[in-house]
């Protein structure tokens, strides 16, 4: 008994066992001592228990199979668990837990080594990527979106600004005879902190000095004061990540509401700045297609096609550190309650679900097909054919098509 107890105690190390309710801990321990689960089986049981609690579903005690053979128990338990994953989520009776009601974080400046200009962190030959360059003026984000990978890379309570950012921008050498697409919303939100530490001053001046750079600000905020009070260079794009009210309320904590994001985009567009919209992630849940359709229709009715440069679609894609961090948190989320399939080394929806959500989204925007650039983000090549009826042969072909379209929309010269 003591020997197996030692094995059990070793197995629960570096797991979320101690974060489970006390009665659940005692139940798992009792069943393990009785059935002699293996090291890996104990870890699986702990993760299942934690996920069910995070999803606000039944406790593992309620669904645990009553059988004296551990193989049968594990088979039935995993089957029951996968059934919870496979069914479309319902947020109707979902209760949030320990969600922050206000943004609380510390600001600091640091002289970062090197410079934050690099390739998009998810760029891959396995997926069709646009070769976006990223410019990290700020590290970490004040929003608390449950699915976001930023939380796995940075300290969420500390927002770090590069004290040498302005000088590094001035010293950046780019080919004046080439068009670049640089995004600023990868390691943080582009607009939520406004012009703190002179970040927007520096970026706007960089855009003015480099008219061959298409500079994209991506946000979930409505903090557009700087855009409204200043002249905006015509090579700047301002884009919003949008979702349904259901997902915003339950998974995009502290971010601006859908109404506020759309109103902010309207104000910016009316000033003559080209805008765009990212539906990433599209999330499957009960009646999700009809709820997303309402958002798509609203954009079609409130914006004209010549105000919008781009619309992108993407969905949930998880790396292991993010899943681990979600399990470590004392909160509730249904964001991982989905059928997992391998997607180029990450976990995502099966292709059948992706095809449904992407094709529905694209067809909903039919009036804009000829005037707005549509694309998929982080998706494998064959999904393009299933969604749009066409694909690009290479990432470079995709990049050229995107830059050409953006340049035309912005009325700037496109240079290969």
Which residue stretches match the model-derived regions?
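Cysteine-centered iron-sulfur cluster-binding motifs in ferredoxin-type domains/subunits
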Residues: 135-145
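Conserved Radical SAM active-site core
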Residues: 101-104, 109-127, 131, 146-241, ...
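C-terminal accessory regions of radical SAM enzymes
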Residues: 334-406
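Flexible glycine/acidic-rich beta-alpha junction loops that bind and position SAM and/or redox cofactors
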Residues: 252, 283-288, 308-345, 380-389
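Conserved radical SAM core fold
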Residues: 188-191, 222-225, 237-255, 281-286, ...
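Distinct, well-ordered alpha-helical segments
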Residues: 195-203, 224-232, 288-296, 322-327, ...
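Conserved C-terminal portion of the radical SAM core fold
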Residues: 261-322, 364-376
């Amino acid at each position: 008994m003591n020997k197996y107890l030692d094995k059990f105690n070793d197995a629960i190390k570096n797991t979320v066992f101690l974060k489970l309710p006390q009665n659940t801990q005692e139940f798992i321990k009792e069943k393990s001592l009785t059935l002699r689960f293996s090291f890996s089986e104990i870890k699986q049981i702990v993760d299942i228990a934690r996920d069910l609690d995070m999803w606000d579903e039944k406790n593992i005690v309620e669904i645990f199979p009553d059988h004296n053979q551990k193989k049968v128990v594990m088979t039935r338990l995993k089957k029951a668990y996968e059934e919870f994953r496979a069914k479309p989520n319902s947020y109707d009776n979902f209760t949030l837990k320990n969600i922050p009601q206000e943004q609380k974080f510390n600001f600091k400046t640091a002289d970062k080594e090197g410079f934050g200009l690099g390739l998009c962190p998810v760029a891959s030959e396995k997926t069709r990527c646009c070769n976006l360059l990223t410019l990290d003026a700020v590290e970490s984000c004040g929003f608390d979106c449950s699915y976001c990978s930023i939380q796995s890379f940075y300290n969420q309570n500390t927002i770090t600004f590069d004290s040498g950012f302005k000088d590094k921008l001035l010293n950046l050498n780019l080919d004046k005879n080439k068009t670049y697409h640089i995004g600023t919303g990868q390691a943080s939100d582009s607009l939520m902190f406004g012009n703190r530490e002179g970040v927007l001053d520096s970026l706007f001046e960089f855009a003015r000095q480099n008219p061959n750079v298409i500079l994209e600000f991506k946000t979930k905020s409505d903090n557009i004061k700087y855009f409204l009070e200043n002249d905006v260079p015509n090579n700047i794009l301002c884009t919003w990540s949008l979702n349904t009210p259901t997902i915003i309320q339950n998974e995009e904590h502290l971010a601006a509401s859908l109404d506020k994001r759309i109103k902010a985009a309207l104000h910016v567009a009316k000033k003559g700045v080209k805008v765009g919209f990212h539906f990433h992630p599209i999330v499957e849940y009960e009646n999700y297609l009809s709820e997303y359709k309402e958002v798509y229709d609203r954009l079609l009715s409130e914006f004209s096609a010549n105000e919008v440069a781009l619309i992108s679609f993407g969905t949930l894609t998880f790396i292991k550190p993010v899943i681990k961090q979600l399990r470590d948190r004392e909160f509730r989320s249904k964001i991982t309650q989905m059928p997992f399939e391998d997607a180029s080394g990450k976990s995502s929806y099966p292709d059948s679900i992706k095809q449904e959500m992407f094709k529905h989204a694209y067809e909903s925007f039919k009036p804009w097909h000829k005037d707005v650039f549509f694309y998929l983000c982080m998706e494998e090549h064959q999904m393009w054919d299933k969604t749009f009826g066409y694909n690009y042969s290479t990432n470079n072909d995709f990049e050229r098509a995107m830059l050409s379209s953006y340049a035309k929309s912005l009325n700037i010269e496109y240079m290969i």
